[in-house]
Amino acid sequence: MASISVDSNESIDKALRRFNKAVQADGILTEARRREHYEKPSVKRKRKEAARLRKLQKMAREANN
């Protein structure tokens, strides 16, 4: 769980920005979006395989440069 401590002289906007960065770093929103609807195991496997292939292609492109 993301948490921050707000100083007495810190603006709310600055604290909110820090909180949003912490939430993004923890991956809370992406996890919530992923769990919003049930995902069948076959769909989950396909999604993971597609992500793995994208990662391999990206690594291959970077290795060629």
UniProtKB/Swiss-Prot annotation:
Pfam families given in the database record: Ribosomal_S21
Keyword Ribosomal protein: yes
Family matches, as Gene3D superfamilies: Ribosomal protein S8
GO cellular component: ribonucleoprotein complex; ribosome
Region (Disordered): 33-65
A GO molecular-function descriptor: structural constituent of ribosome
InterPro entries in alphabetical order: Ribosomal_bS21, Ribosomal_bS21_sf
Segments of skewed composition (Basic and acidic residues): 33-42
Coiled coil (residue ranges): none
Basic residues bias locations: 43-58
Entry keyword set: Ribonucleoprotein, Ribosomal protein
Disulfide pattern: none
Any one biological process term the GO annotation gives: translation
HAMAP family named in the record: Ribosomal_bS21
Family that this chain belongs to: Belongs to the bacterial ribosomal protein bS21 family.
Stated name of the protein: Small ribosomal subunit protein bS21
